[in-house]
């Protein structure tokens, strides 16, 4: 944040340790990509930790001044508006099969089918040939890659341009993407750029909402959890568009998509123009507790003993990025991302009996998200990461018994297990980094993981193409192996965290 007021109130009377804990609670409930802005909300730099108690007394008066809200609106009206904003501008593409069904019915990429290869016996919203299925699902890879890669840009945009400009930029990308998507056809093949704009705009549009939690002193974690829940519920957008397009007589693909742009994103645009502030509402200040003061002193002593109190930015990044606490996190996150992004558009092949149920189950992923966040606060983040990965591991095992597709009952269990894992897909990275590292490099570390992970996840495209041509058994076994590798990485991370709770 660039405003003086916002900067002043962020210097809270809170130790680095307790500050990290508070952030882990808040971020535990966010199911989406992260950017550089994460280190800006209620977390100061590590070097500021010793001076926070002194700064708090100076800034207490500013913190007690209620933030100014446009038109004098009640903070609860703002909360409702922000929740609807999160729902309508959220990562709805993650419930990909609903969007894929609409694309199949519209005839997208049907021109890729070879002469005489079109299967006329399938339903209108099912793929007509393998080539069409591969091309449609390639769009999911493009959107998810763009979503993760541009997450860091969303954070930078928020930090340097402010909430309103960041929200308007994100919405401009979303409106452009969905408009191109609606107009795309065989004669105007704009599907790929549409997906790029869609993915790029999601976090840029969302991050400005974070300062809205500052309107509720003492309830910041709860409000962030509510935002995260509505972003998960945004999966209903794709399901609603699919339902209208398939079941309403006379509905066209272009009309349905542009209707969402006008009604859904149009509402979000009004919120961004008239409610989201130019400068972030300041974080609520709190008086330092005795334990917080002790934590500050202990942290300062530890830094002094290690001789790292005055590290340069480069030295600080080297310390964090090359630490044994961070290095295993990178392959872990990449492997999780690959398995999830392979499964999402392949559900029709892997769990055909639970295919439509999976579209609904995915919407309720906000429930385990909140529960896992609470567990992370009580037991630490690594045990929660183990729970998530074990859900993924069990799902891949079930998918292979007795073959693909597996037992019908198992397919519903797989859908639930995958939804649990997806609900905390990126939030576990937020929590792990904030719990173990000081805030000075949080945005860089999380942005790096999301961006590089998003690029590497492009490998899921050839994985799906191979599976469509040769069967899904081989790649399913590969995903099972990835989950087993992650169990080993998590065990190392658990032992390491017990030995080194905080990287100093």
Swiss-Prot record:
Give the way it sits in the membrane. Answer: Multi-pass membrane protein
- The membrane-spanning stretches of this chain are 76-96, 138-158, 165-185, 206-226, 233-253, 256-276, 324-344, 356-376, 381-401, 406-426, 436-456, 475-495
Q: Is the keyword Transport assigned to this protein?
A: yes
Q: Which GO terms describe its molecular function?
A: L-tyrosine transmembrane transporter activity
Covalent S-S links between cysteines: none
The main place the protein resides is membrane
Q: Which example biological process does GO assign this protein?
A: intracellular amino acid homeostasis
What does the record give as the function of this protein? L-tyrosine transporter that is essential for parasite survival and virulence. May also act as an aromatic and large neutral amino acid transporter. Does not cotransport other charged ions. Involved in amino acid homeostasis by facilitating the net uptake of L-tyrosine and maintaining intracellular pools of aromatic and large neutral amino acids through exchange.
Q: What is this protein called?
A: Aromatic and large neutral amino acid transporter 5-3
Q: Which organism is it from?
A: Toxoplasma gondii
